[in-house]
Amino acid sequence: MKNIALIINDLKGNGAERVVITLSESFIALGHSATIICFNDFIELPVNKKINVLSFNINRWRWIPRSLRGRVVSYFLDRFILRKIGAPDLILSNLLPVDRIMCESKLSNVNLVVHNTMSSEYKFNLDLIENFKHSEVFKIYSKKPVICVSQGVADDFKSLFPLHEGCNQIYNPINADLIKTYANECDVPYKNYIVHVGKFKREKRHDVLIKAYAKAEIDKLLVLVGQGALESEYKALVSQLNLTGKVIFAGFHSNPYPLIKNADLLVLSSDFEGLPTVLLESLSLSTPAISSDCPSGPREILPSNNLFPQDNIDKLAEFLSVPDYSIYKTELPDKFYADTIAKKHLTKA
């Protein structure tokens, strides 16, 4: 039996957090021990009772200068891990706030999981690669092996770290059976609708989706599932385009699967992604899905006929205007199933 630790800031309802839970469930199903360690006691998502969830309060070290904090906190985190679960056979560190600490860890087999295209997320200009080499991000991700969640993320990483020898690509997992169970847990108050699931962040490009929806003039609701800093801005845009009552701001749902299952179509309109879990969830529920052909991930999940040019309102409006969304229906590829992905991670333990 392998002892696996997955470390993340919290368990809010975002893609990386869902992936950590799914991976933990898969490790346990295969007969191994999985522990999730969070830096904050913020849990919005349902967590299997078989998963050991521990809290490591990072806030007590906020007073330490940032230049020293990583080394100091990693020392105490290493001791915390050894005391609570013993020496892990595999450690998966997720997202920059955690990677900033775990890159300094003295424990063995620490892997930093890269969930997004760094050149897009951190706005790095590859023409200024020498400047990038002096950045904090470069220093963090040069210190440990990394696991990239899609081939697009891996290609982007290698362009930024051409000399890094520890870059591996393993897809994010999807537990299709569990998602189908969750999808039947409650009724949906909407009918005849298109759905988007994601935080109201600039890179998700809700503005493109809302404008394309207005241009398409279709007799369907647009249901936006999520929350975030830009929500008020997008509500103002909806009002400006006279779409009040047609665009529904449904808020955050810890279980969005009934809304995905009962939708006529799921849309992703992002400027960039890592491996968009929501597309995998949509396919597992047999809901047609379309996406911007953004870097990276969508083209590794969907056929080309389901991809529209990034930041193209007119083309997205065309996709929304087709009379039958079943043309966008596609099967979930086997390579994304959770047990397959968990076994790939275990080869590194």
Set out the residue ranges of the language-model regions:
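Short His-centered aromatic/hydrophobic patch
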Residues: 92-99, 114
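A short, active-site helix/loop in glycosyltransferases that binds the activated sugar's phosphate group
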Residues: 101, 142-167, 174-176
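Membrane-proximal helix-turn-helix segments that form the acceptor-binding/catalytic region
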Residues: 80-81, 128-147
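A conserved mid-protein helix/loop that constitutes part of the nucleotide-sugar donor-binding site
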Residues: 17-22, 192, 196-215, 229-235
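N-terminal strand-loop element at the rim of the active site
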Residues: 6-14, 18-22, 26-68, 153
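Conserved acidic donor-binding segment of nucleotide-sugar-dependent glycosyltransferases
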Residues: 303-314, 321-324
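Aromatic "clamp/platform" in nucleotide-sugar-dependent glycosyltransferases that forms part
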Residues: 252, 271
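A charged, aromatic-enriched C-terminal amphipathic alpha-helix characteristic of glycosyltransferases
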Residues: 15, 325-349
